[in-house]
UniProtKB/Swiss-Prot annotation:
Protein function: Core component of nucleosome. Nucleosomes wrap and compact DNA into chromatin, limiting DNA accessibility to the cellular machineries which require DNA as a template. Histones thereby play a central role in transcription regulation, DNA repair, DNA replication and chromosomal stability. DNA accessibility is regulated via a complex set of post-translational modifications of histones, also called histone code, and nucleosome remodeling.
Residues that bear N6-acetyllysine: K6, K9, K13, K17, K21
Chain intervals with Gly residues compositional bias: 1-14
Species for this entry: Solanum lycopersicum (Tomato)
PANTHER family: HISTONE H4 (PTHR10484)
Protein name: Histone H4
Length: 103
Protein backbone atom coordinates (compact mmCIF):
# COMPACT_ATOMS: atom_id res chain seq x y z
CA UNK A 1 0.00 0.00 0.00
CA UNK A 2 2.88 2.35 -0.59
CA UNK A 3 2.14 5.74 -2.07
CA UNK A 4 -1.54 5.20 -2.70
CA UNK A 5 -3.01 7.48 -0.06
CA UNK A 6 -6.48 6.73 1.30
CA UNK A 7 -7.57 4.65 -1.70
CA UNK A 8 -6.21 1.30 -0.57
CA UNK A 9 -5.89 -0.75 -3.75
CA UNK A 10 -5.78 2.20 -6.11
CA UNK A 11 -9.55 2.35 -6.44
CA UNK A 12 -10.91 4.80 -8.97
CA UNK A 13 -7.56 5.50 -10.58
CA UNK A 14 -7.22 5.51 -14.36
CA UNK A 15 -9.52 4.19 -17.07
CA UNK A 16 -12.81 5.57 -18.29
CA UNK A 17 -16.16 4.28 -17.07
CA UNK A 18 -17.19 1.75 -19.69
CA UNK A 19 -20.92 1.54 -19.15
CA UNK A 20 -21.85 5.07 -18.15
CA UNK A 21 -25.50 5.59 -19.07
CA UNK A 22 -26.26 8.93 -20.71
CA UNK A 23 -28.62 10.84 -18.44
CA UNK A 24 -31.25 12.82 -20.31
CA UNK A 25 -34.99 13.32 -20.05
CA UNK A 26 -34.98 11.96 -16.49
CA UNK A 27 -37.22 14.84 -15.41
CA UNK A 28 -40.09 12.84 -16.95
CA UNK A 29 -39.46 10.35 -14.13
CA UNK A 30 -41.26 12.85 -11.91
CA UNK A 31 -44.64 11.43 -12.81
CA UNK A 32 -48.00 13.16 -12.94
CA UNK A 33 -49.26 11.25 -9.86
CA UNK A 34 -46.09 12.19 -7.93
CA UNK A 35 -46.68 15.90 -8.65
CA UNK A 36 -50.33 15.41 -7.71
CA UNK A 37 -49.34 13.90 -4.34
CA UNK A 38 -46.99 16.81 -3.60
CA UNK A 39 -49.78 19.26 -4.44
CA UNK A 40 -52.22 17.38 -2.21
CA UNK A 41 -49.72 17.56 0.65
CA UNK A 42 -49.64 21.32 0.06
CA UNK A 43 -53.45 21.49 0.31
CA UNK A 44 -54.35 21.71 -3.40
CA UNK A 45 -57.75 20.36 -4.46
CA UNK A 46 -57.81 20.71 -8.27
CA UNK A 47 -54.84 20.87 -10.62
CA UNK A 48 -54.68 22.38 -14.12
CA UNK A 49 -53.18 20.17 -16.84
CA UNK A 50 -50.47 22.75 -17.59
CA UNK A 51 -49.09 22.54 -14.05
CA UNK A 52 -47.18 19.28 -14.52
CA UNK A 53 -44.60 20.50 -17.07
CA UNK A 54 -44.23 23.81 -15.23
CA UNK A 55 -43.60 21.97 -11.95
CA UNK A 56 -40.97 19.75 -13.59
CA UNK A 57 -39.18 22.83 -14.93
CA UNK A 58 -39.16 24.62 -11.57
CA UNK A 59 -38.05 21.46 -9.73
CA UNK A 60 -35.21 20.92 -12.21
CA UNK A 61 -33.89 24.47 -11.69
CA UNK A 62 -34.18 24.15 -7.89
CA UNK A 63 -32.31 20.83 -7.83
CA UNK A 64 -29.61 22.13 -10.18
CA UNK A 65 -28.94 25.03 -7.79
CA UNK A 66 -28.85 22.83 -4.67
CA UNK A 67 -26.64 20.21 -6.33
CA UNK A 68 -24.24 22.85 -7.71
CA UNK A 69 -23.78 24.34 -4.23
CA UNK A 70 -23.46 20.89 -2.62
CA UNK A 71 -20.75 19.85 -5.08
CA UNK A 72 -18.94 23.15 -4.45
CA UNK A 73 -18.82 22.35 -0.72
CA UNK A 74 -17.61 18.82 -1.51
CA UNK A 75 -14.84 20.03 -3.83
CA UNK A 76 -13.72 22.65 -1.32
CA UNK A 77 -13.29 19.89 1.28
CA UNK A 78 -11.32 17.86 -1.33
CA UNK A 79 -13.78 14.97 -1.15
CA UNK A 80 -15.40 12.97 -3.92
CA UNK A 81 -18.54 12.03 -1.99
CA UNK A 82 -21.34 14.53 -1.42
CA UNK A 83 -22.50 14.19 2.20
CA UNK A 84 -25.83 15.03 3.78
CA UNK A 85 -24.15 17.99 5.47
CA UNK A 86 -23.08 19.40 2.10
CA UNK A 87 -26.74 19.42 1.07
CA UNK A 88 -27.82 20.91 4.41
CA UNK A 89 -25.28 23.74 4.04
CA UNK A 90 -26.29 24.31 0.40
CA UNK A 91 -29.95 24.62 1.40
CA UNK A 92 -29.06 26.94 4.28
CA UNK A 93 -27.10 29.14 1.87
CA UNK A 94 -30.24 29.48 -0.23
CA UNK A 95 -32.33 30.43 2.80
CA UNK A 96 -34.05 27.04 3.22
CA UNK A 97 -32.77 25.69 6.52
CA UNK A 98 -33.30 21.94 6.89
CA UNK A 99 -33.31 20.28 10.31
CA UNK A 100 -32.78 16.65 11.21
CA UNK A 101 -29.70 15.72 9.17
CA UNK A 102 -26.94 16.69 11.61
CA UNK A 103 -25.06 19.91 12.18
Amino acid sequence: MSGRGKGGKGLGKGGAKRHRKVLRDNIQGITKPAIRRLARRGGVKRISGLIYEETRGVLKIFLENVIRDSVTYTEHARRKTVTAMDVVYALKRQGRTLYGFGG
